[in-house]
């Protein structure tokens, strides 16, 4: 998927210059004059990262980040804050609140592009991890109650005979359940199963 850098700044000249900078590097952008405008269209499937001015009329950058994190849609793309004022406490607070980076204006063009590309790469990794977790959860949900019991005991390290004794079932039945668990979970062996759960 091709991601877009979304820029929120109440200063039109900065929005335009950042849009031009990213476009000159072949990176798609979309600009917003206010955080409320972005929120009105959220969630944005193409959002790879957000570049937010810290101080804006109406909703500040940190307030916009808080609003996005409070939304039920889930994963918020990485946020890069821009500020015209060196404010170490605000930078620390923003990073603790989940910002990807904090950049002081004026900034080096290559530096802001590199940070945005790193943010997009981090977001792609987080999306891939979330999709993998969802796939494992869906596979786990496909297990019968007995298969789920057998899987839990397999993950405890019990052998088929021990599982059979614990559950009061035949060892051959355990072998069938074990085989089904591995097949449904898409695991070749117990080590694969342990890695995905």
Swiss-Prot record:
GO molecular function terms noted in the UniProt entry: DNA binding
Pfam families found in the cross-reference section: GerE, Response_reg
Residue ranges flagged as DNA-binding region: 160-179
Modification sites for 4-aspartylphosphate: 53
PTM notes: Phosphorylated by DctS.
Region (Inter-domain linker) location: 128-135
Any one GO BP annotation for this protein: phosphorelay signal transduction system
Sequence ranges assigned to domain Response regulatory in this UniProt record: 4-120
Record keywords, A-Z: Activator, Cytoplasm, DNA-binding, Phosphoprotein, Transcription, Transcription regulation, Two-component regulatory system
Keyword Metal-binding: no
HTH luxR-type domain residues: 136-197
Gene3D superfamilies (UniProt xref): 3.40.50.2300, Winged helix-like DNA-binding domain superfamily/Winged helix DNA-binding domain
Cellular component, GO, one term: cytoplasm
Subcellular compartments: Cytoplasm
Primary role: Member of the two-component regulatory system DctS/DctR involved in the transport of C4-dicarboxylates. DctR functions as a transcriptional repressor of genes for C4-dicarboxylate transport.
PANTHER family documented for this protein: DNA-BINDING TRANSCRIPTIONAL ACTIVATOR DEVR_DOSR (PTHR44688:SF16)
Full protein name: C4-dicarboxylate transport transcriptional regulatory protein DctR
């Amino acid at each position: 998927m091709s991601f877009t850098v979304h820029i929120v700044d109440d200063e039109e000249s900065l929005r335009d210059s950042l849009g031009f900078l990213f476009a000159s590097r072949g990176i798609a952008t979309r600009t917003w004059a206010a955080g409320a405008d972005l929120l009105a269209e959220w969630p944005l499937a193409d959002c790879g990262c957000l570049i937010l001015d810290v101080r804006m009329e109406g909703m500040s950058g940190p307030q916009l980040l808080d609003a996005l994190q409070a939304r039920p849609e889930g994963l918020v793309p990485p946020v890069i804050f821009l500020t015209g004022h060196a404010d170490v406490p605000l930078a620390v607070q923003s990073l603790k609140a989940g910002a990807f980076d904090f950049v002081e204006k004026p900034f080096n063009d290559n530096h802001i592009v590199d940070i945005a590309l790193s943010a997009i790469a981090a977001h792609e990794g987080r999306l891939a991890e979330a999709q993998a977790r969802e796939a494992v959860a869906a596979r786990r949900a496909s297990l019968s109650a007995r298969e789920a019991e057998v899987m839990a005991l397999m993950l405890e390290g019990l052998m088929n005979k021990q599982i059979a004794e614990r559950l009061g079932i035949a060892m051959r039945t355990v072998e069938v359940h074990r085989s089904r668990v591995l097949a449904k979970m898409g695991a070749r062996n117990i080590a694969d199963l342990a890695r995905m759960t």
